[in-house]
UniProtKB/Swiss-Prot annotation:
UniProt keyword GTP-binding, yes or no: yes
GO molecular function: GTP binding; metal ion binding; molybdenum cofactor guanylyltransferase activity; nucleotidyltransferase activity
CC annotations in GO: cytoplasm
Protein name as annotated: Probable molybdenum cofactor guanylyltransferase
Subcellular location: Cytoplasm
Signal sequence, renumbered to the chain: none
InterPro entries in the cross-refs: MobA-like_NTP_Trfase (IPR025877), Molybde_CF_guanTrfase (IPR013482), Nucleotide-diphossugar_trans (IPR029044)
Keyword Transferase: yes
Catalytic activity: Mo-molybdopterin + GTP + H(+) = Mo-molybdopterin guanine dinucleotide + diphosphate
Family per similarity comment: Belongs to the MobA family.
Gene: mobA
Chief place of localization: cytoplasm
Organism, scientific name: Aquifex aeolicus (strain VF5)
Length: 201
């Protein structure tokens, strides 16, 4: 594993993380965020990783009680629809600072090193992780995007990638040795892969 260093410039700009936890887990067949891997719920693993980097970490969700076991501050989604862009909008609207880190709640293999790598390569207004695909829910977003996001939500356009194409963004190419940390747990097949990787590391 390579060694990562913190750049003061990046960290001074990004002190807050929002973990998005408002999805329905339809493809997984049960609530994936509450699924336990080695004695810890998926959302718990992601939250602890975020806490190891940021001064403030919030959970963005539709149900405050559901995540009470984390003893973490919960921000309730601004809209009823279950879409990632709703969580993003809620996070940016709640944010006190200009830039915040956004992290999907279904990344049980996420590591501090991956988060730091994205931070080190942060450029405004948006920087998101990239492997063979773009990971729009692992990155830094600016509050300046609020108006454009709201416009898209009102039109029923929930595509984050379309938003990024519109506003411009920076792709942070994740090193090969950290790419496994970006594996989403959407299905039971994903879970099998995640458990195999977890046992390997």
């Amino acid at each position: 594993m390579r060694t990562f260093t913190w750049r003061k410039g990046s960290l001074s700009k990004v002190n807050t993380c929002y973990v998005l936890a408002g999805g329905k887990s339809k493809r997984f067949g049960e609530d994936k965020l509450l699924y336990e891997i080695k004695g810890k719920k998926v959302i718990e693993r992601v939250y602890e990783t975020a806490k190891s980097v940021f001064k403030e970490v919030y959970i963005v969700a539709k149900d405050r009680e559901k995540f009470s076991f984390l003893n973490a501050p919960v921000v309730l989604d601004e809209f009823e629809e279950s879409a990632s862009i709703i969580g993003l909008y809620t996070a940016l609207k709640h944010a006190k600072e200009e830039n915040v880190f956004v992290l999907s709640g279904d990344l049980p293999l996420m590591k501090k090193e991956t988060v730091l790598y994205v931070l080190e390569n942060f450029k405004e207004p948006v920087s998101v992780a990239k492997t063979e695909k773009l990971h729009t829910l692992v990155g830094v977003y600016s509050k300046k995007l609020l108006e454009k996001i709201e416009e898209r939500i009102k039109k029923g356009d929930y595509r984050i990638w379309a938003l990024l194409k519109d506003v411009g963004y920076n792709e942070v190419e994740i090193p090969e040795e950290l790419r496994y940390t970006l594996l989403n747990m959407n299905t039971k097949e994903d879970l099998k892969r995640i458990l195999a990787i977890e046992n390997h590391y």
